């Protein structure tokens, strides 16, 4: 049996980021062959990651990376808020975002590129990790805003940096779905209109009054779901359109990501339960 030296264990730790005892065990099993040990650890890690894949990963972080004219927004998920704050998890998420920006990768290419690193992180941390979404935003002028690490926004348009930054903050808080009322898709408008017509008819209003009510309610609806039609959070008596006009600014597009959107979350765990879950693996 080959001797497993401390130097060999140290090298394996540096190359895999695995724990000391795990590295020693792998080297003993591989009879001191570090390349075989790494191969075996990767196979073991892939098996563990496959078992974790069914676990709901609805926590995590939103990362934003920017360079001239382009920004990348990334969502990386884990199972618990405890792990979402882990330095290793955040380092992984930041590296993925940097590569997404530098290489302009879509989500499929990004997931493929980082699959080995993801498996290694799952093995180390003991939770399911998912590279869920990436959005690339281009524009003449860009502004970004992150609310903690849970919400991220990038706004593209024209105007002063401070103005666009405030618009990004508004998007984070108010969750508009479209830039302008006219951008609301026809099918969405028709669906809402049908609802409002039924409501008006059920209220027993005369047809002429009901039609006017529906027109008013639809104008309100398209305003509420669009950025420029919303009341500006910092000056509620004005709309975002008013603010943009005053500042000589405009918005062409925006992207807002929030951790866990659309994912059905499991019952919330206490902090103690989260720690216990991480320790159990």
Swiss-Prot record:
Molecular function in Gene Ontology: translation elongation factor activity
Location in or out of the cell: Cytoplasm
Pfam families: EF_TS (PF00889)
Residues covered by region (Involved in Mg(2+) ion dislocation from EF-Tu): 80-83
Disulphide-bridged cysteine pairs: none
Keyword tRNA processing attached: no
Keywords in alphabetical order: Cytoplasm, Elongation factor, Protein biosynthesis
GO (cellular component) term, any one: cytoplasm
Primary location group: cytoplasm
Family: Belongs to the EF-Ts family.
HAMAP family (UniProt xref): EF_Ts
Protein's job: Associates with the EF-Tu.GDP complex and induces the exchange of GDP to GTP. It remains bound to the aminoacyl-tRNA.EF-Tu.GTP complex up to the GTP hydrolysis stage on the ribosome.
Protein name per Swiss-Prot or TrEMBL: Elongation factor Ts
